[in-house]
């Protein structure tokens, strides 16, 4: 059930939350951890409870990694299509977790899957968001060679979201991988051009350029920190904010 969070007013009306498929694994090496799904559903429910409209894009890396198969000779387009199907599986699992918490949710797929998901339709997605449904966008952009990060930024622009929130395993963007370099320093704020110039690897080039060209703010944060998502939505300074530079 969507939880009411008293006394906290949202800064954003509509967000696009990007989750990695790996985030759904929890402590496992593969697949989906039901406890992680339930926790994420609870946090998303808190946002719905304060009137925030939530669009969601989930990667597929917990179920399928095309890089190794591509290196072994698999056709890239075939691998990308398999990856798209993995994102649909994750979307269905998340919808189930949300609905078990009495949070209405809809899965839309960029690839037609009659009887399994709704086909992606921008106007229909916005109507559902306006009624308080969580809309899960799956199958990426529907095209090979585009990442789910690019899909998240594209959908955010299409539905006129206020911000893209990218959930990761670390609490923002660093000068280097903080798991490998103990001297890595965290950025609190960056411009799109700084991300590109420094080759920080927050998202792929296409995704960052989409956000830059359409002035879509992007915040990178640690989804494993309890309450971080809600704190961002009510105006907290979690993680790293990436936005247009000041003229």
Curated annotation (Swiss-Prot):
Pathway the protein takes part in: Pyrimidine metabolism; CTP biosynthesis via de novo pathway; UDP from UMP (UMPK route): step 1/1
Activation/inhibition comment: Inhibited by UTP.
Gene3D superfamilies (UniProt xref): Acetylglutamate kinase-like
GO biological process: 'de novo' CTP biosynthetic process; UDP biosynthetic process
Keyword ATP-binding in annotation: yes
Gene Ontology MF, one: UMP kinase activity
UniProt subcellular location: Cytoplasm
Main location (coarse class): cytoplasm
Top-tier EC class: transferase
Positions bound to UMP: 60, 80, 141-148
Residues given in the record as ATP binding sites: 18-21, 61, 65, 168, 174, 177
EC nos: 2.7.4.22
Role of this protein: Catalyzes the reversible phosphorylation of UMP to UDP.
Assembly behavior: Homohexamer.
Family per similarity comment: Belongs to the UMP kinase family.
Name of the protein described by the UniProt record: Uridylate kinase
Organism: Pseudomonas entomophila (strain L48)
Organism placement in taxonomy: Bacteria, Pseudomonadati, Pseudomonadota, Gammaproteobacteria, Pseudomonadales
């Amino acid at each position: 059930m969507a939880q009411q969070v008293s006394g906290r007013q949202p800064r954003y009306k509509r967000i696009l939350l990007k989750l990695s498929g790996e985030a759904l694994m929890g402590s496992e090496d593969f697949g989906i951890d039901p406890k992680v799904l339930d926790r994420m559903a609870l946090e998303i429910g808190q946002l719905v409870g304060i009137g925030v409209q939530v669009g969601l894009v989930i990667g597929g890396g917990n179920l399928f990694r095309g890089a190794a198969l591509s290196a072994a000779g698999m056709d890239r387009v075939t691998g990308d299509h398999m990856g798209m199907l993995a994102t649909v599986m994750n979307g269905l699992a998340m919808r189930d977790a949300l609905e078990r918490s009495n949070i209405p949710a809809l899965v839309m797929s960029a690839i037609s899957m009659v009887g399994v998901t709704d086909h992606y339709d921008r106007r229909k997605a916005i109507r559902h968001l306006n009624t308080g449904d969580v809309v899960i966008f799956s199958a990426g952009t529907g095209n090979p060679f585009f990442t789910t990060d690019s899909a998240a930024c594209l959908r955010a622009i299409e539905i006129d979201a206020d911000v893209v929130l990218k959930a990761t395993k670390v609490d923002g963007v660093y000068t280097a991988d903080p798991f490998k370099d103990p001297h890595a320093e965290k950025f609190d704020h960056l411009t799109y051009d700084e991300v590109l110039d420094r080759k920080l690897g927050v998202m792929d080039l296409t995704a960052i350029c989409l956000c830059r060209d359409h002035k879509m703010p992007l915040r990178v944060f640690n989804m494993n920190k309890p309450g971080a998502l809600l704190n961002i939505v009510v105006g907290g300074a979690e993680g790293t904010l990436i936005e247009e530079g000041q003229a």
